């Protein structure tokens, strides 16, 4: 079972709202997920991003792979640098 951290679309037509979830890679985009670890609202100004950093950090250490978009959001929040430091600067 490959676990991914990815976006789960919610909201109305033309008003997207994304939950950042941990899900099995075989599940559909808006299908079942294991845990919700944050959300992203690209419509609001400024764009709203809420992350549960502890849960995301735990999942990344367990081997969960973020999607490209989620990786970009995590890098902007500084989580990928934190993971890199924890992994290589013991």
From Swiss-Prot:
Keywords: Ribonucleoprotein, Ribosomal protein. It comes from Lactobacillus helveticus (strain DPC 4571). It holds the Pfam family Ribosomal_S16. This is Small ribosomal subunit protein bS16. The keyword DNA damage does not apply. One of its GO terms (biological process) is translation. One of its GO terms (molecular function) is structural constituent of ribosome. InterPro entries: Ribosomal_bS16, Ribosomal_bS16_dom_sf. NCBIfam families: S16 (TIGR00002). Belongs to the bacterial ribosomal protein bS16 family. GO terms for cellular component: cytoplasm; small ribosomal subunit.
């Amino acid at each position: 079972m490959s676990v991914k951290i990815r976006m789960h679309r919610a909201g109305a037509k033309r008003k997207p709202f994304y939950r950042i979830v941990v899900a099995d890679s075989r599940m559909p985009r808006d299908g079942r997920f294991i845990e919700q670890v944050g959300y992203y609202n690209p419509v609001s100004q400024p764009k709203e991003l809420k992350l549960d950093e502890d849960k995301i950090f735990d999942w990344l250490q367990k081997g969960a792979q973020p999607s490209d978009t989620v990786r970009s959001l995590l890098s902007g929040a500084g989580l990928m640098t934190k993971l890199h430091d924890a992994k290589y600067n013991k």
